[in-house]
Amino acid sequence: MAAEEEDEVEWVVESIAGFLRGPDWSIPILDFVEQKCEVFDDEEESKLTYTEIHQEYKELVEKLLESYLKEIGINEDQFQEACTSPLAKTRTSQAILQPVLAAEDFTIFKAMMVQKNIEMQLQAIRIIQERNGVLPDCLTDGADVVSDLEQEEMKILREVLRKSKEEYDQEEERKRKKQSSEAKMEELPVYTSEAEKMSNSQGDGEHFVQPPSEVKVHFANQSVQPLARKMELLPETSSLTQKGLKIPGLEHASMEGPIANLSALGTEELRQREHYLKQKRDKLLSMRKDTRTKQIQNTEQKGKPTREAEEMTEKPEMTAEEKQTLLKRRLLAEKLKEEVINK
C-alpha cells in the first residue's frame, strides 16, 4: 500500500515537473515576468505596485495549474502532497517549482522579478555593445574620468609642493644672510668694549691688556703677538677665574649677539613656517577644487556635438520611452555589478 502511494506521489511530481518545463506553462509565465519586472528594484521597499503585480501573477499561476490538473485528473490534495514530498525538496525540483512557490511567497516573487530585471538589463547592454561595437558614454561607469582627475590633481600637488619648497628655501636663505650681516655688525663694538674694559682692569701685578697701539698679553713669562692677530691665545676664562681675576663684560659676552637669540629665533622660525605652509595648503585646496570643477564640466560638455552627429547619421533617434528604458537598465546593471564585486 505504501509502495503504491509512493509511486503515485512520484508520478504526480514527475507530471507536474514536465508541465512546468513545457511551453504551456513557460511561455505565459515568462511573458508576464518580462513585461512586469521593469518596475522591480532591489533598493526599493515593497510598494503597492509590487503587491498588485504579485496578485496578478498568483491568479495566472492558479489558472494555469488548475487547467492542467483538471486535464490529467490530479486533485488539490494530491498536488499538495506532491509539493511537500521529499522528491520535491531536491535542488533541481526546487528550481523547477520556484515559479509556483513565488505565487504564495511574496519574498520569493520579488527576488525572482528583480533577478529577471537585471538579466534583461544586461542583455540589452550586450545587444547595444554588439551592434555599435562599444558602449555609449551614458553606460560607462566613469572610471577613466575619475582616474584622469586624480592624475591631474597629483600633478598640481607636486607642482605646488615644489614651488612651495623653492619659495621657502629662498626666504630662509634671505633671512640667514640678513642675520649673518647683522651679527657681524654687532661683533665689532663688542670686541672694542671688551678691550677697553680689559685695559682698565688690572690684578695681581700682571698686565693682561695694554694700550691698543701695543696690545700684548703676558702670560707665563711669554710674549704673545698683538691681540688683533692672535685672539685665540688669550687665557681661558676659567684660568682667570681661578686667579681671582674678573674681566668686566667678558663673562656676559657669550650670551650676547646671535647666540643668545637662538631659542627665540627657533620659535619664531617654526611659527613662520607653520603659517607659510598653512597658506600653501589653503592655496592647494582651492586649486584642486577649481581644477576638479573644470574637469567635470569639460568632461560633461566634451563629445556632446560628436555624439549627436553620430547618432543623427548612423542611428535613428531613440524615442523618449526607449531612453527611459535604457536609463533604467543601466541603473540596474550598475547595481548588479556592485553586488557581484561585493560578493
UniProtKB/Swiss-Prot annotation:
InterPro entries: BART_dom (IPR023379), BART_sf (IPR042541), CFAP36 (IPR038888). Residues 279-293, 301-323 have a biased composition (Basic and acidic residues). It is found in: Nucleus; Cytoplasm; Cell projection, Cilium, Flagellum. Its main location: nucleus. Residues 165-188, 279-323 are annotated as: Disordered. Gene3D superfamilies: ADP-ribosylation factor-like 2-binding protein, domain. The modification Phosphoserine is found at S85, S147, S201. Residues 147-187 form a coiled coil. The keyword Nucleotidyltransferase does not apply. Keywords: Cell projection, Cilium, Coiled coil, Cytoplasm, Flagellum, Nucleus, Phosphoprotein. GO terms for cellular component: ciliary base; ciliary transition zone; cytoplasm; motile cilium; nucleus. Belongs to the CFAP36 family. May act as an effector for ARL3. Interacts with ARL3. This is Cilia- and flagella-associated protein 36. It comes from Mus musculus (Mouse).
